[in-house]
């Protein structure tokens, strides 16, 4: 009898280590509440993230401290309620224009006439930066960090059922890359040079078809991958972002979850977060492209070498309503001592099989001991 009780106690201890997260794979953490949040970019040179929410900007440090940014006289307050996506300057040189983008300057889509971009200096002062003509609105923004677009700021906007991609230099001058790209919107990103045949291209998602596109500096458009995620307006793939070097050793991924009333995915007005180590167990590697849906925040990784492959990372949809960029930040370690222990993040089938085998083994041991 004593051995039977010991066997049951051992089984209970084993099961206690298998949390719901283990059975379902990686899951987003509701990290910080930010009213109206819809985008996150960065980090700035001081390590803080830049967050947009309901016509306002915020800075968030790695500890989760949220402070208003550019909220004083001459600061930024515009397009409340609209998805005025943002980009933060890494301080790169535009050779063709003989000038630089100042480090940590923020650039915000202007979603009223005249459509364009507002520059918010690192000190918090805001002023019009560029006007973008010929578009019906604007719906995407990203810096060329690789150089094939000469390190310019890239924006997207709908034009008669297609999409225009416009490059903006550090003097605010614009050049249309193409006005015939497929329908796309959301968090855009420029691929690093090692991303197979798509290195240096602008990568953009289309929630309606589920495709992920690459736009070259000459305006040519290619399909990177079929995401395999759910499709449809307010549902399909909305956001992309690349995994930087060192991320899988220590890093965190951020995504904006915007509260959206009367929607099947109502959101929470939270900045979502997930540790790198929970995704590496699913096969994530540095240099991969991450893509997430607007409805439910499910996510895949795309790896391109000679060919491209797609790996599911988060497969279970939630009530999250994702918007803006996916931001992977290297050098942010997982929770330390005192935090909840990390789960194994094993696939559900593996967990069930493991539990069954352990139960059989313990039962067999108990029977043998009773026969002695």
Where do the PLM segments sit?
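Residues marking helix boundaries in flexible regions
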Residues: 3, 345, 361-363
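Sequence/structural signature of beta-propeller domains
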Residues: 23-343
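C-terminal membrane-anchoring or membrane-association module
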Residues: 357-372
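Bacterial N-terminal signal peptides that target proteins for export
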Residues: 1-7
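Juxtamembrane/start-of-transmembrane alpha-helix segments at the extracytoplasmic/lumenal side
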Residues: 341-356
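Bacterial N-terminal signal peptides
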Residues: 9-17
């Amino acid at each position: 009898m004593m051995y039977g009780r010991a066997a049951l106690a051992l089984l209970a201890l084993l099961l206690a280590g298998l949390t719901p997260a283990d059975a379902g794979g990686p899951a987003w953490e509701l990290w910080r509440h930010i009213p109206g949040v819809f985008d996150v970019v960065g980090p700035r040179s001081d390590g803080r993230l830049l967050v947009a929410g309901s016509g306002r900007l915020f800075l968030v440090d790695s500890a989760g401290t949220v402070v208003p940014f550019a909220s004083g006289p001459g600061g930024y307050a515009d397009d409340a309620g609209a998805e005025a996506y943002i980009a933060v300057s890494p301080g790169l040189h535009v050779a063709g224009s003989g000038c630089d983008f100042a480090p940590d300057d923020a650039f915000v889509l202007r979603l009223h006439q005249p459509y364009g971009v507002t520059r918010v200096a690192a000190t918090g002062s805001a002023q019009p930066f560029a006007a973008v003509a010929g578009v019906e609105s604007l719906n995407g923004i990203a810096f060329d960090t690789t150089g094939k677009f000469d390190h310019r700021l890239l924006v997207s906007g709908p034009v008669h059922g297609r999409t225009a991609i416009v490059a903006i230099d550090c003097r605010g001058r614009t050049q249309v890359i193409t006005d015939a790209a497929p329908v796309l919107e959301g968090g855009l990103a420029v691929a690093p040079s090692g991303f197979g045949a798509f290195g240096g291209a602008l990568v953009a998602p289309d929630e309606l078809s589920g495709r992920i596109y690459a736009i070259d500096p000459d305006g040519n458009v290619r399909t990177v991958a079929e995401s395999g995620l759910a499709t449809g307006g307010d549902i399909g793939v909305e956001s992309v972002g690349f995994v930087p070097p060192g991320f899988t050793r220590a890093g965190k991924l951020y995504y904006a979850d915007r509260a959206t009333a009367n929607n099947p995915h109502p959101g929470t007005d939270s900045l979502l977060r997930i540790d790198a180590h929970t995704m590496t167990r699913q096969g994530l590697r540095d240099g991969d492209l991450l893509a997430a849906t607007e409805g439910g925040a499910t996510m895949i990784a795309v790896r391109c070498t000679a060919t491209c492959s797609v790996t599911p990372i988060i497969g279970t949809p939630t009530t999250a309503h994702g918007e803006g960029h996916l931001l992977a930040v290297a050098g942010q370690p997982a929770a330390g001592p005192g935090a909840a222990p990390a789960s194994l993040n094993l696939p559900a089938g593996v967990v069930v099989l493991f539990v069954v085998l352990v139960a059989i083994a313990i039962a067999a041991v108990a029977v043998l001991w009773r026969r002695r």
